[in-house]
Amino acid sequence: LNKHGDRQYEIAQTHGVVGDYPIKTGIIYDTSVVETKYKAQYHNHPNFSRPSLSQRFIYKDSLEFVLCTNHFKSKGSRNAKGLDLDQKDGQASYNYKRILQAKTLLDIIDSLYFDENIIVLGDFNAYSQEDPIQALQSTNLNRLETVNHSYVYKGKNGSLDHVFVSDNFIDHIDHIQTWNINSIYPSWINYSHNLADSSYFRSSDHNPMVIGVNR
């Protein structure tokens, strides 16, 4: 990013142990727009497949908010047992696990960031009407609606990626959109394949989401 663009980005420095997870979330920020306050914090909990990560930012020297990024358990059935087995209700495997992860995330937010400006986002591996998303929306978190899908699975469009904003911060959001640069393109141009080029298309299997924040 820094080599090919005009902006200067940094990786949020973290506090806390990540553990031995093969996948972890991270936060990259534009130093000309926001500054960090304290180090980013990984939230390790037995219910998480990958620990949640939060960073406190100050936007344009005045607006303070917390960004919390997440990656919930996937829908794959490998090693699923008991309540994590596919219940044939359309929510696939590990729905129970994802519900627990949603509730754990809410407990963390309530404990550490109660009544603060907060944006909660990530790959929740759940569609908008599924139990984990409904659990998150049952609080003071508002899911921001976007027109385009974020993922394609076996030719079917849907959104596994979501953005939630606390009641006291929603007036600072002026737009949200899904940038459709990944999911509609074939996997053989994925960045990890030999046929990949230097464009941003298919840089991931999920589409990024763009949020506009104002003071």
Residue ranges of each PLM-predicted region?
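Divalent cation-coordinating acidic motifs and surrounding scaffolds
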Residues: 1-215
